[in-house]
């Protein structure tokens, strides 16, 4: 039983290392964007003064992580992440 618990903890730790952080794209970070099939270009256009303010707010870059337990204080849930048979919480700030 102790061996099973230890092996389970090691597997979860390995998944956490692979899943956290997934994607860092902020001016403050110096990591490169990872190219891949997940990259999608989205174009959003709004009209009027209210639309331009909304566009500025939406165009800010997010820092996202897959977390095991839940999001931290300043993060919000944006969905889920899957790695084999485990499901994580996708948190962005």
Swiss-Prot record:
Its protein name is Alpha-defensin 5
Q: Which InterPro entries match?
A: Alpha-defensin, Alpha-defensin_C, Alpha-defensin_N, Beta/alpha-defensin_C
Of which family is this protein a member?
Answer: Belongs to the alpha-defensin family.
State any GO BP term from the record: defense response to bacterium
Task: From the Swiss-Prot or TrEMBL record, state where the protein is found.
Answer: Secreted
Q: Which organism's genome codes for this protein?
A: Mus musculus (Mouse)
Q: Which keywords accompany this UniProt record? A: Antibiotic, Antimicrobial, Defensin, Disulfide bond, Secreted, Signal
Signal peptide coordinates: 1-19
Quote the function comment for this protein: Probably contributes to the antimicrobial barrier function of the small bowel mucosa.
Q: Return the PANTHER family for the record.
A: ALPHA-DEFENSIN 1, ALPHA-DEFENSIN 1-RELATED
Please name one Pfam family that this protein belongs to: Defensin_1
Cysteines paired by S-S bonds: 64-92, 66-81, 71-91
Cellular component GO terms held in the UniProt record: extracellular space
Prosequence residues removed at maturation = 20-58
């Amino acid at each position: 039983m102790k061996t099973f618990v230890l092996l389970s903890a090691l597997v979860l730790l390995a998944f956490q290392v692979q899943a956290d952080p997934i994607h860092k794209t902020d001016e403050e970070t110096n990591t490169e964007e990872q190219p891949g099939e997940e990259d999608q270009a989205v174009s959003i256009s709004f009209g009027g003064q209210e639309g331009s303010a909304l566009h500025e707010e939406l165009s800010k870059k997010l820092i996202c992580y897959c977390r095991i337990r839940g999001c931290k204080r300043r993060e919000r849930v944006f969905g889920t992440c899957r790695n084999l048979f485990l499901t994580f919480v996708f948190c962005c700030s």
